[in-house]
């Protein structure tokens, strides 16, 4: 994981629409590595950056869900709920919206 993290950290963002998706994926992968290392706060930051890098109906709700799960892993249920609510509000037709409803139900 350390080698992968170092490799991804060297990545230079790409401009343009295809670049936005690649940039988001890079940030998301760094978040995934942080989760594997149980560094959930760092993971949340990467997932938030991934959402900003490519705010679309496919990747944004996925990274919001991952950010919520990372917040729950830290015991931050209110912050997790905010991520799930954002999915329901901003991306109600996404695949993650169903999961977000279930995850919100488990918190409340």
Regions found by a protein language model. Give the residues of each.
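Short solvent-exposed coil/turn linkers within tandem alpha-helical repeat scaffolds
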Residues: 12-24, 51-59, 88-99
């Amino acid at each position: 994981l350390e080698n992968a993290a170092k490799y991804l950290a060297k990545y230079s963002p790409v401009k343009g629409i295809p670049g936005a998706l690649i940039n988001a994926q890079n940030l998301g992968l760094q978040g995934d590595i942080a989760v594997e290392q149980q560094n959930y706060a760092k993971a949340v930051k990467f997932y938030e950056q991934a959402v900003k890098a490519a705010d679309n109906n496919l990747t944004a709700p996925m990274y919001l869900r991952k950010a919520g799960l990372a917040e729950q892993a830290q015991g931050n249920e209110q912050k997790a709920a905010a991520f799930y609510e954002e999915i329901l509000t901003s991306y109600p037709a996404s695949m993650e919206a169903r999961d977000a409803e279930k995850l919100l139900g488990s918190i409340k």
